[in-house]
């Protein structure tokens, strides 16, 4: 009897047939395991479970980078025993303490983010297999290492859409196991919640990788293209005379049908299609592999959602999933904007119109009989959204709904202000709204204009205003001239970093001569406005760091211009190279950032990638200078993305609001025992500098964050030239933004060649006078003093099993 492993079959016109079905669910994994036998060397951790990485890697990280807990309150309200007071080392009725409770709270946010990306990947994978078939090849650019995160986790190297399914199933299976641990009466140790969070973070990067590679392959996105087209950005790029279809969310699956309908009916020049959040980024990637002239627009990040609705410009809004405001329907309804929900994860209580005739649905929405509809049938979605936009435009124009308030209405709002200060007290950014309103009463709106860029559009101020002033609308009305000029450029998301780019830059990164990789990712919950991200990126680009971006961070970097009127994307090349600005893509493209570091270990370092997370992460931690920045992190996805970076040894700096995630990972840089590793050549212990000194930390200002990130790119394996370059940048940036010399700069000196060249003599004098080091001034050499010996051939590792003779 033949055995069916995967695929499908049909039986017709047969009698007395017996069908035996055994392990259907595991069939895909069995087939993948059979194929894996031909792949070559395999690491020890393929198909990991909750405990797989715990002792071999996670606890080693957590021993050096100890969790620092920042509780939001002293109570646990998790079950009906509670609420329980956990202050002063008390335990709850179930036995859990404050550490365990907060470990669980942080972990819950990480697995929520992981589930969000995994569900995104599952939706796209199933949809694209249905459309293109399982045999569609994964063409992602000129690379052999196509799926580093999948390969490290499962040991597999999928080459088609269908071959991704086992990795998807494994991620979903482990998410179920992880979710089970948050139930009352399960895990209670904070350290094990942290270990599980790290594991969940690694799975998050698998889910993101699946999400992006399937859409790159099937939807003809740019494929590791450093010259991907430049895309127009900003509200000012929207032609107000044309119908405007606005899309919001992260899943581009349905949007491609709108674009297809527009192209088939020659409408691309007759109406505007633009978006917010990552759907905006991905719609500008659709069919851009051949660098065709783009016609879609990026409006901005999540902080712009309510602002664009209040402007009255959208004629129809289509939402899909993730980072979409919960008040879009009532806000849009005030201005006669129909809302279409195109994904089952956000349905807003709207009626489903999948089974209704297209014309009837358009008429129902156009008449205002319903505020919106759920349309999950993508063919209908494409037609209805485009046609409805064209029909709504003249109706809303005639009704005066496509513009913000009149000057008279503005004056009436401003004059109502009682200067009570309630708006200031609830503003998460502590904006000086009362002060701005006071000046506005005197006819000076400039103070309101200054608030526009810093305002995150949350509307908390409006909800406490006793005079019911629509404060966000007041700010936006005052800023109309500025908004009309909001025009930037962003390079379309290019996808992965190619193997060739890794080979070209790998040596420079490992030796330290390219100072490091700065990854600017995450949400727009900035403490001081979006321009801070621009300043940070510009500073590192001018210093020849590689700056990579995704999502809201990638958008906001492109919204500001220099004195010559150029954006960063116009000023700097798009390749993964020293001084390059690389827009990887949307949020799910973050997997390619960790993937780039993993490729350095696999391609340049020659490490086995298959099922070998600990060894790859160990290589990155000790050798690859990289630091992430999630300056406006707000979501659960941001916590899972950052935690996935952390397990691979990549530190991340978060903005001032991020202490609300409840956990940081910070080392004791003064404890020499924490800064010892093995030399793989002999197995002997060797001292290393405290680098990087954190894995997850918050900064109060962008000026504080910059030197912190430069320092976080120092690695134990830097050669002398690389160490000198990195110390030069760190010390100069510390002087520029903090003032003075860093207190611990001397800990990173192994030999006089490590010292910044321009200040070598001055620093040697400080080492002699302030730290008691012995200097031979005739030869200008350090004779004694450093605790760390320099050996260019040393092989630092945290894993005893990698040592010779182990």
From Swiss-Prot:
Which residues take part in binding [4Fe-4S] cluster 1?
73, 77
The EC number(s) attached to this protein equal 1.2.7.4
Cofactors per UniProt?
[4Fe-4S] cluster; [Ni-4Fe-4S] cluster
Record note on cofactor: Binds 7 [4Fe-4S] clusters per heterotetramer.
Q: Which residues form the signal peptide?
A: none
Q: Look up the record and name the pathway of this protein.
A: One-carbon metabolism; methanogenesis from acetate
Quaternary structure and interacting proteins, as annotated: Heterotetramer of two alpha and two epsilon subunits. The ACDS complex is made up of alpha, epsilon, beta, gamma and delta subunits with a probable stoichiometry of (alpha(2)epsilon(2))(4)-beta(8)-(gamma(1)delta(1))(8).
Present the record's domain note.
Cluster B is an all-cysteinyl-liganded 4Fe-4S cluster; cluster C is a mixed Ni-Fe-S cluster which is the active site of CO oxidation. Cluster D is also an all-cysteinyl-liganded 4Fe-4S cluster that bridges the two subunits of the CODH dimer. Contains two additional 4Fe-4S clusters, dubbed E and F, that probably transport electrons from ferredoxin to the B cluster.
Question: Which PANTHER family does the entry mention?
Answer: ACETYL-COA DECARBONYLASE_SYNTHASE COMPLEX SUBUNIT ALPHA, HYDROXYLAMINE REDUCTASE
* Name this protein carries in UniProt: Acetyl-CoA decarbonylase/synthase complex subunit alpha 1
- Species of the source: Methanosarcina thermophila
Instruction: Name the gene for this chain.
Output: cdhA1
